[in-house]
A protein has these predicted regions:
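N-terminal amphipathic, basic-rich helices that act as targeting or association modules
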Residues: 1-79, 204, 215, 239
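A glycine-rich helix N-cap at a beta->alpha junction
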Residues: 86-96, 161-175, 368-380
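Active-site nucleophile and cofactor-binding loops and adjacent substrate-binding regions
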Residues: 39-48, 67-72, 101-119, 142-146, ...
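Glycine-rich ThDP/TPP pyrophosphate-binding loop and its adjacent helix/strand module
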Residues: 108-264, 270-277, 281-282, 286, ...
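Glycine/charged-rich beta-loop-alpha catalytic/anionic-binding loops adjacent to active sites
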Residues: 29-36, 95-111, 133-139, 312-324, ...
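Peripheral docking tails and interdomain loops at the edges
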Residues: 263, 271-274, 385-387, 407, ...
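Non-catalytic terminal/interface segments that mediate subunit docking, oligomerization
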Residues: 248-357, 362-372, 473-475, 489
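Cofactor-binding active-site loop characterized by glycine-rich and histidine/acidic residues
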Residues: 41-162, 298, 303, 312-313, ...
Length: 586
C-alpha cells in the first residue's frame, strides 16, 4: 500500500514510476469506494488521477500554483496534499469540500465551484508573480466541458500575451456533463485524430505554444510531458486525452450518468436509493416535448446541464433540432434566447438558480431592455437545494425580480406551474422567468388557475380570507404559509393566506384592502431576505401602522450546512414562525 504513506507531495516523489502506477490504482479504488458511499463527481475525478499524480511529481506545490477549473476534478489533488483520510476513512468523508478550499490546505488557492474561471485566475497569479519578480510555475487545469464558457476564451486571450510562464492543461475527455457542443470541440477532435499535428490548431492561433499527450491516463507519459513544460518561459497549452470515468466500467460506459452521482452500488452501478417520483424536471421535459410536437418553433435551451429540466439523452434525440445545448455558456443561452424570441420562435431556457447569476448582464441588456418574450425556468431556488458555498441557490429573487420588464412568477404546485409555463410560451409581451418549485411536485390545490396571466398581472391569489394576520407564502413556501395558518387556528386566529404569484410586482389593491382588518403581514420566501420579495411588502407599507414580519434566509455565504438546522437558524420552521406571530400580536 503506497497511499497510506502519502501525506504530502514530497512523499510521492520518493516513488518510482512503477510504484506511481500502483499508487494511481490505489487512489482510484479509494475514490470509487468513497463516492459509492458519499456521492460526488465520479467520472471527472477518475479520469484525472494520473495527470494529477504526474503534476505533483514533477512540480513543486504549493510554491508552484495549481488552479483547477470548477475544481470538481481536484479529489486526487486533495489525496496527495495531506487530506487522504477524507478519502480512505469513512469517519472522515465529510471533512473536506468537494471543491478546492484554501482553508483546508496551502495547496488550494481559491474557492471555486463554477466553470471556466481557471485560466483567468491563473493568469492573475502569473502576472502578480512577474510584478513581484518571483519564479514559479502557474498551472491552470481546465476541461470536462469548461472550455465552452466565455470566460475561458477571455482568459486564454489574455494569458497568451503574458510573455512568461503559464501552463494550461486541457483535460480533453470528449465530454461536458453530457456530450460536448460547440465548434471548438471539433478542433479538439481533429487534434486528437492527428496526434496534435493538425495545422488547424485553436491554441496556436491564440498565441500559445502547444504539446499533445495521446494518453493522459499513462502516468509515465504525463511525467514526461510535465517535465518538458516545467519552468517554461512562455504560455503553453498541454492538451491531454483522457477517459472520463477511467477504471470503473459503469462510469466509462455511462459518462453523463456518472458525471456526478448520489451513492451507488459498486457491482451494479445502480443508485443505493432509487430516484423518487417524477420531479419537475421530468414533468417539464415531457410537457415541452408535447408542445414541440405541436409547434416547431418551441425550442428548449440548456447551458450544459440538460438534466435540469429532464432532457435525458433519449428526450434530446426526440426533440432533435428543437433542443439546443450551448455548452456551459449561460450568457450565450440568454442572449440567443432573446434573439430567438425576437425572430418569432418560442425559446425556453432551463437553468439552475446558482448558474443564472452568470448571465445577469444578458438578462438585463440583451433580454429585458429589448423586452423579448423568452421563457427562463429557474430550478432549485431554495435553501434546501445545493448546500455548498459555490452553488447556493438563494439569490435569484433579488437578482431577477428587480430587472425592469421582467415578469418573475412563483408557482405553488404542478397545475399552477404548467398554466404559467403555457402562458409564458404563448404570450408575446414580456420576458418571463418562472421559479420552479424546489420541494418536490406538489399536487392539485383544487384551484382554477388562469390560462392568461396578462389581465392578472401582479394580482394575488387570496387562498383564504381571514383577519388579524395575513401570511404571504412565496412559491415553495406557500405550503409553509398554510401550515402556519393551521397552527394559528389553535390559538383562535383565522389568518389570511396569500399566494403572491408574481415576484416582480405588488397587488397594491389587495395590500390596501388588508389594512382594514389586519394588523400584521408576514412574508415567507425560500431565498435571501436582502432585496427579496418581503422587502417589497415592507417598503410598500413603510411608516404606516401595518406591522410587517419578513422571513427568509440571512445574507451570507454558508457551506456544507444541514438544511434543517439552517431553516431553524433563520426562524423558518412552522413552530418558530407561529410563535413569532403570536408574540407580535400579543
Amino acid at each position: 500500500m503506497y497511499l497510506e504513506n502519502i501525506n504530502s507531495p514530497a512523499d510521492m516523489k520518493k516513488l518510482s514510476v512503477g510504484e506511481l502506477t500502483s499508487l494511481c490504482a490505489e487512489m482510484r479504488e479509494a475514490l470509487i469506494q468513497k463516492l459509492s458511499v458519499h456521492g460526488g463527481h465520479v467520472g471527472p475525478n477518475l479520469g484525472m488521477v494520473e495527470a494529477t499524480v504526474a503534476m505533483h511529481y514533477v512540480m513543486n506545490s504549493p510554491v508552484d500554483k495549481f488552479v483547477f477549473d470548477v475544481s470538481h476534478q481536484s479529489y486526487a489533488h486533495k489525496m496527495l496534499t495531506g487530506r487522504k483520510e477524507a478519502f480512505t476513512n469513512p469517519d472522515c468523508y465529510d471533512e473536506v469540500s468537494g471543491y478546492t478550499e484554501p482553508s483546508e490546505s496551502v495547496h488550494d488557492h481559491f474557492v471555486i465551484g463554477h466553470t471556466s474561471t481557471s485560466v483567468s485566475l491563473a493568469s492573475g497569479l502569473a502576472k502578480a508573480r512577474d510584478l513581484r519578480g518571483e519564479q514559479f510555475n502557474v498551472v491552470a487545469v481546465i476541461g470536462d466541458g469548461s472550455l465552452s464558457g466565455g470566460e475561458a476564451f477571455e482568459g486564454l486571450d489574455v494569458a497568451a500575451e503574458l510573455g512568461s510562464n503559464m501552463i494550461v492543461v486541457v483535460n480533453d475527455n470528449q465530454m461536458s456533463i453530457a456530450e460536448n457542443h460547440g465548434g471548438l470541440y471539433h478542433n479538439l477532435q481533429l487534434l486528437r485524430e492527428t496526434n496534435g499535428e493538425a495545422s488547424c490548431n485553436f491554441f496556436k492561433a491564440m498565441g500559445f505554444d502547444y504539446l499533445y499527450v495521446a494518453d493522459g491516463n499513462d502516468v509515465e507519459a504525463m511525467i514526461e510531458a510535465f517535465s518538458r513544460v516545467r519552468d517554461i518561459d512562455h504560455p503553453i497549452v498541454l492538451h491531454i486525452n483522457t477517459l472520463k470515468g477511467k477504471g470503473y466500467r459503469f462510469a466509462e460506459c455511462q459518462k453523463e450518468r456518472f458525471h456526478w452521482s448520489m451513492p451507488f452500488d459498486i457491482p451494479t452501478g445502480e443508485l443505493k436509493k432509487p430516484a423518487g417520483d417524477k420531479g419537475y424536471d421530468t414533468l417539464t421535459a415531457e410537457h415541452l416535448l408535447s408542445l414541440m410536437k405541436a409547434d416547431r418553433t418551441v425550442v428548449g435551451i440548456t447551458a450544459g446541464t440538460p438534466a435540469v429540466f429532464g432532457f435525458t439523452k433519449d428526450r434530446r434525440e426526440r426533440a432533435g433540432k428543437q433542443f439546443i445545448d450551448m455548452g456551459i455558456a449561460e450568457e450565450q443561452a440568454v442572449a440567443m434566447a432573446s434573439a430567438l424570441a425576437k425572430g418569432g420562435a418560442k425559446p425556453v431556457f432551463g437553468v439552475y438558480s446558482t448558474f443564472i447569476q452568470r448571465a445577469y448582464d444578458q438578462l438585463s441588456q440583451d433580454l429585458c431592455i429589448n423586452n423579448n418574450p423568452a421563457t427562463i425556468l429557474v430550478f432549485w431556488g431554495s435553501l434546501g437545494a445545493m448546500n455548498d458555498v459555490t452553488h447556493l441557490c438563494l439569490f435569484d429573487i433579488p437578482l431577477i425580480s428587480n430587472i425592469p420588464n421582467m415578469v418573475y412568477l412563483a408557482p405553488t404546485c404542478r397545475e399552477e406551474y404548467l398554466t404559467m409555463l403555457d402562458w409564458s410560451i404563448q404570450q408575446t409581451e414580456h420576458p418571463v422567468a418562472i421559479r420552479v418549485p424546489a420541494t418536490g411536485v406538489a399536487g392539485s390545490r383544487s384551484v382554477d388557475f388562469p390560462t392568461d396571466y396578462e389581465p392578472e398581472m401582479n394580482r394575488f391569489e387570496m387562498a383564504h380570507c381571514g383577519s388579524g394576520v395575513a401570511i404571504i407564502g412565496v412559491g415553495n413556501f406557500f405550503a409553509l404559509a398554510v401550515t402556519v395558518a393551521e397552527q394559528l387556528k389553535q390559538s383562535g386566529i383565522d389568518a389570511t393566506v396569500v399566494n403572491p404569484r408574481f415576484l416582480t410586482g405588488l397587488d397594491t389593491e389587495r395590500l390596501e384592502g388588508l389594512r382594514d382588518s389586519h394588523s400584521l403581514v408576514v412574508t415567507l420566501e425560500d431565498g435571501v431576505l436582502d432585496g427579496g420579495y418581503g422587502e417589497k411588502i415592507a417598503r410598500y407599507y413603510g411608516e404606516s401602522e401595518m406591522h410587517v414580519m419578513c422571513r427568509g434566509v440571512r445574507k451570507e455565504f454558508i457551506d456544507r450546512y444541514n438544511v434543517g438546522e439552517e431553516y431553524a437558524a433563520n426562524r423558518l420552521t412552522p413552530d418558530q414562525i407561529t410563535a413569532d406571530i403570536l408574540e407580535i400580536l400579543n
